[in-house]
Amino acid sequence: MRIRNRIAIWAVAVGNLLTLVPSAHAIPAFARKYGLPCSACHEAWPMLNNFGQTFKDNGYQLGNERDAPIYQEPSYWPVMFRVTPMWHRETNERQAVDAVPGSATSGLVESTFNKSGFDLGGVDMITAGTLYKNISFFVQPFIGNNSITLAQAWARFDNLAGSRWLNVKMGKFELDEPISQERSLTLNNTGGLYYTYLFTPPGDNNFFGGIGFPQLGVELLGHSANDYRRYSIAAVSSNNGTPGLPTNQTFDVYANFNQAFEAPWFGRQQIGVYGYFGQSPTFFQTANGNPIPGTGMGNRSFYRVGAYGIWYVNKFDIYTFYTHGYDNVFLGNSVPANQPAKLPLGAAGPVWNGGFVEVHYNPNPRWIALGRYELNRMSREANPSTPGNSGNFDTWTVGYRYYPIMSPRAGLAWLQEYSRILNAGQAPISGKNGIHDSLLLGFDFDF
């Protein structure tokens, strides 16, 4: 069995009752450091405004005497904790269950399955800032209910040769995504992820899990003085951000370019393009039949490319995202490249298109409402015998956040969200659409 860690949309939908996975962050430590309110950097935390994005792109620096840690008060501690106590309800409308509970021989039937209760998604910790002027860092451990992981850890050299266009980062980091997964406003199980960032067709054996995962590598990035023009080019190990060199010895390349401009009557707008180009092994060297980590062979190519826009109209902002994906025929059919005879007749590399539209209504800094529609459509299946809609999905998400507290010391949001996902043909017995719903109410606070 291959060593891998990826999310196929049908597996997410079946498994989304098990865990709360999104992780996003605002960092009140920066507000304490500079004496600024959270709203200086956040349109609605954890979502950044243009000033916050510029501050982040500058390596968490304002360009004044407070940037270097040697000028900070000894009592300043650049650490943030984020916790989300909640109540949530999860529904699977076509769960396979025994016809007679406890009887494995009674046969399986589809039934609606519900569970609900109070829960805790874990504790997000972040320490970030500057080690010295123009040397930035970021470390993000996550304490889950059953594990502790290091979500991100990187160091960055800023303004090389005195130019804001030359910055270098190394470590495990979030890719410069078109719209940040880490800063998503939604936390519920069904609508808390941008699935088009993570999609892999059913039956595909690509080790790459999607641009939504932090990756291990090095990044060259830069921006204009007002942050209206930005670029990022990253070379990352082909291991989906997993430490320990578990796959092969190749590298993937990710690039993102965007440009903002002023539109009459509406102000700042932003457009961009991105691409991820990589290779994934199709088999491993073995010992007694067991794969040896790091010995991946038979590499085959894949890519994800797309375009996006962020549009502002009065108190509304609208995120639009489009993606086009392709995996090699061996990856799509989970066939080792050294055994081409195992490919089914008429096999091809899977191709798909997806995207989402997300709308925010932000009448004031303490309140924001949102709605999102996301979809994916397969345009070519890897195996011609596979139903043409296998891998298609539609997701609807609505919610709001109210912020009674937003200070340089802490922030708290009351949130309510509802999301519904339809996975075409994924019902385990009838082959109908798999349907999952998630309702979440809770507090999201950091300090």
What do these predicted regions represent?
Residues 1-11:
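Bacterial N-terminal signal peptides that target proteins for export
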Residues 12-14, 24:
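Cleavable N-terminal signal peptides
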Residues 27-37:
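Sequence/structural segment immediately N-terminal to covalent heme-attachment motifs in c-type
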Residues 35-45:
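The canonical Cys-X-X-Cys-His
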Residues 49, 79-91, 95-99, 111-241, ...:
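Outer membrane beta-barrel
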Residues 64-84:
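Short Fe-S-cluster ligation motifs
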Residues 154-157, 161, 265-447:
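Outer-membrane beta-barrel pore domains
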